[in-house]
């Protein structure tokens, strides 16, 4: 049996842009994607700390060092620039893998610059 487990998150990031006319997804600074081990086009959950909205989408790469967290498409109705969010990724793991899994937690400052990486 496989279990769906939390494996990584970018914690308390700040939304920098919301583009209603974009096709969809969330644009994330590539440095943050790398730190969290989230791939381009990977499914992510976004939990809005500011207003409580939650959604599923997929990750796109933004310029390195830009701090961009861009909410695209219809999701821009639910999240606005300045909102604080958690971006989380999950994966399927065997029982053995799940028991030793150490999720990555990427902490950022108010400008979405990497502060530290710590296990969950």
Swiss-Prot record:
Protein modification = Is synthesized initially as an inactive proenzyme, which is activated by self-cleavage at a specific serine bond to produce a beta-subunit with a hydroxyl group at its C-terminus and an alpha-subunit with a pyruvoyl group at its N-terminus.
Report the domain of life of the source organism: Bacteria
What are the catalytic residues?
A: 25, 58
This protein's pathway: Cofactor biosynthesis; (R)-pantothenate biosynthesis; beta-alanine from L-aspartate: step 1/1
> Where does the chain bind substrate?
57, 73-75
- Keyword Nucleotide-binding recorded: no
GO cellular component entries: cytosol
Annotated catalysed reactions: L-aspartate + H(+) = beta-alanine + CO2
Modification type Pyruvic acid (Ser): residues:
25
Its needed co-factors are:
pyruvate
Question: What class does this enzyme belong to in the EC scheme?
Answer: lyase
Write down how the cofactor binds this protein. Binds 1 pyruvoyl group covalently per subunit.
Q: Which InterPro entries match?
A: Asp_de-COase-like_dom_sf (IPR009010), Asp_decarbox (IPR003190)
- EC id: 4.1.1.11
Q: Which UniProt keywords apply?
A: Autocatalytic cleavage, Cytoplasm, Decarboxylase, Lyase, Pantothenate biosynthesis, Pyruvate, Schiff base, Zymogen
GO MF entries: aspartate 1-decarboxylase activity
Its chief place of residence is: cytoplasm
Relate the protein's function as given in its record: Catalyzes the pyruvoyl-dependent decarboxylation of aspartate to produce beta-alanine.
- HAMAP family the record matches: PanD (MF_00446)
**What family is this protein classified in?**
Belongs to the PanD family.
Indicate the quaternary assembly.
Heterooctamer of four alpha and four beta subunits.
Specify the protein name.
Aspartate 1-decarboxylase
Q: Which organism is it from?
A: Deinococcus deserti (strain DSM 17065 / CIP 109153 / LMG 22923 / VCD115)
């Amino acid at each position: 049996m496989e279990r769906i487990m939390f494996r990584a998150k970018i914690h308390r990031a700040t939304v920098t842009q919301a583009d209603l006319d974009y096709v969809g997804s969330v644009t994330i600074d590539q440095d943050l994607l790398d730190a969290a081990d989230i791939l381009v086009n990977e499914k992510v959950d976004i939990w809005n700390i500011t207003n409580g909205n939650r959604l599923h989408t997929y990750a796109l790469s933004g310029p390195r060092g830009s701090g961009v967290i861009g909410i695209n498409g219809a999701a821009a109705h639910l999240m606005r620039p300045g909102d604080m969010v958690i971006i989380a990724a999950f994966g399927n793991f065997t029982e053995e893998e799940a028991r030793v899994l150490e999720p990555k937690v990427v902490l950022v400052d108010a400008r979405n610059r990497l502060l530290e990486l710590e296990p969950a």
